[in-house]
Amino acid sequence: MKKEKAVVVFSGGQDSTTCLLWALQNFEEVETVTFHYNQRHQEEIDVAKSIAEKLGVKNHLLDMSLLNQLAPNALTRDDIEIEAKDGELPTTFVPGRNLVFLSFASILAYQIGARHIITGVCETDFSGYPDCRDEFVKSCNVTVNLAMEKPFVIHTPLMWLNKAETWKLADELGALDFVKNNTLTCYNGIIADGCGECPACLLRNKGYDEYMKMKGERN
């Protein structure tokens, strides 16, 4: 464990919760930052606060409602259907979201004396989001370091993992059931197993089933 401080970009979903648990095993001090951008469901904010409290971690909640004004999308507007047309980005894409989140997480890290920033973005289960790519995160890391003259390190523990491998990591961290039962991934705001029908639930549940099958074959 590094005797250093880290900030986790935290939504209360499967990926960011797994990253938080990873951070707690790798850094002496860990805090989380959650962004309120008028998400479709208030439950996301409530779940993030609840998980942080259960794990004994300080949670910073930042108002980013400007994103909703600049980039109307299916994550913030009930009247926009969740869909992904061929050759187009999904309607759940929020332009610049991770750019903004990592920038503000870096500002927070600067203020609280943290060097490490952890985000759960992943390129393997790539949904067409350009700001989930490894090259984007590395570029952003260089930019925030230059902007603040600090040697920040942005970590992406899930970057090359598919959903089954992300469940495997949660299991290796001793928190498979915790992640399964306490996180919110569902676009319809249903905790744990979710609605089972939206794209996020389908991806999450497919990964869980694949991992449990692999785990059963090994045992």
Swiss-Prot record:
Enumerate the residues binding ATP.
10-20
User: Top-level EC class, please?
Assistant: ligase
Pfam families reported for this sequence = QueC
| Cofactor needs | Zn(2+)
Protein family membership: Belongs to the QueC family.
NCBIfam families in the record: 7-cyano-7-deazaguanine synthase QueC
Name this protein carries in UniProt: 7-cyano-7-deazaguanine synthase
